[in-house]
Amino acid sequence: PYLLSDPQVAADQLGIYGANVKIAVVMIMFTQAFRYAYEPFIFAKTKGEDKRTTYAMAMKYFVIVDLLIFLGVMFYLDIIRYFIDPRYFVGLRVVPIIMLAELFSGIFFNLSLWYKLTDRTQWGVYFSLIGLVIIVALNVLFVPKFGYIACAWAAFACYFVMMFLSWLVGQKYYPIHYDLKSIGKYLLLALVLYGIAVSVPIENMLLRLGFRTILLFIYLIYLIRHDLPLNQIPYLNKLIFKKQK
């Protein structure tokens, strides 16, 4: 609020941004839950022979689920937005930016295992300081001109740079062969589906939600075909096996 000359405008901008951040809380909650479960898991796996493969798989499925949450929130934003005051609907454009920033934050946390396992935790401080400089600098430079939208892009840039640097340095000290090709395909698919959803004008809300549900199913079908065969799910496997008999 101190970056804007008019206190009332500053308060309004802060209220709009804060309200719309609440919409992204689903992804934030998933990331937090993952954090609580992941650290005990990685330290329990430090003696396993296939530990690096397991870490890579955990990263891949984290991104897959996070992108699913992203699509779910964005596709049904017509309904979810009513969890906040209609006065703040003007700020809904920051929601996808915030959610992608949170995705990068979660990936950064996944990547952080390399400096924890190799006892180079000072790198965590370095990355955090770099992120701090980026987010403060971008807010100071752009908030006075662009308002709350600059806050969202500052967070996006901050977490993206931290994520990239952690991956880059981590490959030197503790190389893990993440399935970047597969992760990239899911990210591209999610962004393309989101782009289609927002670029196709459908005035009727029910028809719009129906169309976006089809797009969400496309993502799920791709997931099932490539990384989550139904016959690998215990209960469904029994049903499939019975039918085959």
Label every PLM stretch briefly.
Residues 16-128:
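Specific pore-lining/lateral-gate transmembrane helices of multi-pass inner-membrane transport
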Residues 95, 107, 111-137, 148-156, ...:
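Alpha-helical transmembrane segments of multi-pass membrane transporters/permeases
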Residues 7-10, 122, 129-164, 198-214:
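Membrane-interface helix-loop junctions in multi-pass transport and translocation proteins
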Residues 199-245:
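Membrane-proximal transmembrane or re-entrant/amphipathic helices at the cytosolic face
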Residues 48-49, 53, 118-120, 171-181, ...:
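Membrane-interface helix-boundary motifs at transmembrane edges
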Residues 1-7, 78-89, 201-203:
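Membrane-interface helix termini and inter-helical loops of multi-pass transporters
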Residues 41, 79, 114, 140-145, ...:
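Membrane-interface helix caps of multi-pass small-molecule transporters
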Residues 25-29, 70, 106, 132-139, ...:
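Hydrophobic transmembrane alpha-helices of multi-pass small-molecule transporters
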